Structure formats: C-alpha cells, structure tokens
Amino acid sequence: MKFLSYLVLVTISLGAVSNPSTGQDAKPEDQNAVSAKRKPSSMMEDSPVTFPERGALPAKYGRDVKTESYPVEKDYFLFSSPCRSLELIEKIQTEMPTGEFTPPPTDWKYLARTRQVLTEGGDLHVLGLGDSIVNDTFRSAWLAKLAAAYPKANIRGTVYVRGGGGCRHYRFEDRIQKYLVPLKPDLVFIGGISQGKDYEAIRDVIAQIRDALPEVEILLATGAFGTTDPRRPDLLAAAQHSGSSDYGMELKKIAAQLHCGYLDITTPWAQYIRSTDLHPHRFYRDRVHANEWGEQILSKILLSFFEVSR
C-alpha cells in the first residue's frame, strides 16, 4: 500500500519547533535497566561515534508538534503522541540511510477491531506502555504516518512510560487503574527492552487492563536498540528483549494464550541496520537509545506491520 503524504485529523495541536539541541532529551530521561554501565556494549570496540559520558548527542531535528502532558507520579511520564509532523518525518526519512527488512507477519485475529477501524473508519486511540525505548518508538511519530495511510480513521496516541519501565512496575500501586484505564485506549502497545523476562508481570498487566476494558486490543512487541549488537545473531539470540531469544518465544506464547497481537520488532530492526553496511551506532544517540534515524527504522517496521492488504 502506498502511504499518502498528507496530514489527517489527530487530537493534538501544532506548536513551535522544539530546540534541536534538546529534541532528543524528551521524556523519559535516558535511563534503562539495560545500561552501558551495567552491561558494556561490544559495539563500542569499533564504534565511529563518540557519545557523551552523560546524556545524549544533540538532535538535528526536534519536535514540531505540541504534545499534552498529563499528571502522573514521579519518574513516570504520560503524554500525547505524535510529536512530529509528516513534513518533518519526510525530511528525516529522506536523509537517513536506506535499508531493507522483511516485513514482520501480521495476524489480525486478535487485532480485528483495529483493522476494521483502519479500513472502514472510526476512532483508534493507541497507547504505548513501557520504557524509554517505547518512548522513542512513539516519538518516531509512526502514528502520524499510520493516520495518513488510513484517512478514514481518526487516530490519536498516548505514551505512558518510565525509564527502565516494564510491566513489573505498572502492575503495582494501582497504576493501570489510575493512569491507563481512564484514558480508555482501543489498542495498547506493550514493548521495550526492560521487561526483564518477568512473564508473570506481563500477564498480570494484561489481566488488569482487560478487567477494566474488556474490549481493548493488545499488541505485545519485542525490543530493539539497547546494548546488544544487531550485527551478531548469536548475541541477539541471548538478549533478554529479543524476538530471536527465548523471550521472544515466550512472549509469542503469551500473546496466543491471552488473545493479543504479537510483533517481533527485533528481527527487522537488525536486518535494516545490517543492510546499510554502517556501524549500528550511526542510528544511536547514546549507547542505548535511537537517534532520529533509528526511530524511523521502528516507524517503518510498525507501518509494515499494520499493512492491512497483507
């Protein structure tokens, strides 16, 4: 399907362009359970990029769409998405290195309402739940591209994240009931690199969401970026967030058992980076997180996953 290059209605307003020097320092703060200090990356051995000791490299492009933040407890962040316009996304994608990947398979069995809204119209509120990798995924503004591709649908997004955040954090203190349920999302995206193979917590969060919102659809996704070298299939097969590891197999099993969609985002992400013949850090802003180019890889993967004609 050809993705149309015009804006459609979203439930956020346009704002001033963010300062490019701070654009990548968006919420949440750059911290994760999988950090360079805890787990040094082998990618540093041949990296052509010098990262700051603290913080991230300055962004070339900031955000040109104003987002709305909502009250939430300390160290957690809750705000609207997307934060970039189609024009800015196009500029970033035009400049980024071209790569290739095999589109991940899409089984619409447990995402039937989402598919119906995309093709026939209606409201689709997508909520991203997880860590700073989930934040980066939604900062790619893939929802703006999705809205342009399916103009009959009224698509909006919300991001609920914590640095290093996984379901083991969201399951407690009534966080799902206090902060997620009142937003009444239609589709919840649970992903990132910080789940820590806590499968009980993932199941518990799904149950809490479903108890309050029985019609909600849920998409479970494996992780991307972090410190694992995507050029090394053997390392990916051992990574705690990877679609090619036992984590991916278990997450897929949970998705089938609990009637959720499943997305292995790890494999196409690694394929894209390898196909460019560039060092992976060309797509990073620090030792763990994506820069603007890296975020757009995630956007391309998600857009291919939600291709209804496949």
Task: Give, region by region, the residue ranges found by the protein language model.
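A short helix->loop->beta-strand "cap" motif at the edges of active sites that frequently abuts
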Residues: 211-218
